[in-house]
C-alpha cells in the first residue's frame, strides 16, 4: 500500500500542509476553493477617496500572504477602481506564475468605462449580451488570462430577458472563456427562474450567489439562503465584518474620532448592539471581534465562502485566524438575540410566530411548519450543516 501511495504521488502537498483546508464550491460545482475568498475591491488608487488608500506594493503583499496560507479564491470586478483591481490581480498572477492555481471570479454589469468621459457609456453596463461581450473581453485583457473561473452578473437590471441572459452566458461557457456562472445582488425569484430556464434548455446554471450578509444585516436568510440550498448553489457573502462597523467599544469611540478609511457603511443601532455581543464572545475566547463575526456566517449554513478584503496586510492575517473559531448553538443564538430580525410573511406565517406574539422566526424546513405539526409527530431528516473548524 505504501508503494501504491508513492506511485500516486504521496510526496505532493496535501491540505494538511497548508493553513487552509479546501472545500467544494457548491453541490453543483466541484471546483475546490479556500474557505475564504480574497476580495480585491480595494486594490487600486482610482477610488482611494472612497475606499481608502492601498498601494500596489501593499496589494501584492496581501495576495502573497493569502496565497502562502493556501488561499486560492480571489474576487474582483470589471469596474473596481476604474479597472485597476483587475489589472493588479492580473499582474500579480503573471509575476507569480500561478494563474491556474487561482480560482478567479470577476463580474460584469456595472459600467466600467465611466472614467473615459468621451465615450458613449450606455452599453458598457447592464446585463445585456453586448455589455457581457465587451466587458468579458476587457476583463480577460486586464487579467492577462484566457479564461475566467467564475463570472458573476453583478446586479439585476430588470430589463434583460432571462433567455437573452442565460443563452449569452452559456455561450461564454461553451467557448471556454468562462467555467462557472455566478449571480450577485439579484432577487431570489430571478435566480430561480433563470436556473429553471437553464435546466429546461440544457444550459449552464448559476452555481454561486454573492450578496451582503452579516450578523447585524440578516436579510440574506429570508429568501437567498433557502433558494441557494434548494438550487445547490454556494454563497459568497460580502460585508461580513459590517464594512468596518463591527467595533469594540474602545475601537468605535476611536473611529468616530479619527474617521479613517472608507466613507460609507451602516452605523445603525443593530451594528452597535451586535458588536457588544461579538466583543463579549471574542474576549471570552481570546479572539478578535472580527474573528467571531466571520465565524458566525461560516457556521450558519454550508457552502459559505465569505469575501474578505482590506487595505492592510494585518486585515487578511486576522481573517485567516477566524477559521479556527468555533461557536456553539447557544452563542449563535446570543448573537442573534442582539437585535430583532423579522423574516416577514410568509415565513412567519409558516412558523406560526406571526400569530402567537412570539419572537418572529422563519420556517427553515418541514419540521418548522406549525400547521403540519397539528397532523401528528413526524421525524424529519436534518438539513446539511456547515463544516466545523478543523479539530472541533
UniProtKB/Swiss-Prot annotation:
InterPro entries tied to this protein: AKR_Detox_Biosynth (IPR050523), NADP_OxRdtase_dom (IPR023210), NADP_OxRdtase_dom_sf (IPR036812)
Positions with a binding annotation for NADP(+): 75, 184-185, 210, 239-249, 311-319
Region of interest: Disordered: 242-263
Pfam families, alphabetized: Aldo_ket_red
Pathway in which this enzyme or protein is active: Mycotoxin biosynthesis
Site (Lowers pKa of active site Tyr): 107
Keyword NADP recorded: yes
E.C. no: 1.1.1.-
GO MF annotation terms: oxidoreductase activity
Record keywords, A-Z: NADP, Oxidoreductase
Induction: Expression is positively regulated by the dothistromin-specific transcription factor aflR.
Annotated function: Norsolorinic acid reductase; part of the fragmented gene cluster that mediates the biosynthesis of dothistromin (DOTH), a polyketide toxin very similar in structure to the aflatoxin precursor, versicolorin B. The first step of the pathway is the conversion of acetate to norsolorinic acid (NOR) and requires the fatty acid synthase subunits hexA and hexB, as well as the polyketide synthase pksA. PksA combines a hexanoyl starter unit and 7 malonyl-CoA extender units to synthesize the precursor NOR.
Protein's name in the database: Norsolorinic acid reductase B
Lineage: Eukaryota, Fungi, Dikarya, Ascomycota, Pezizomycotina
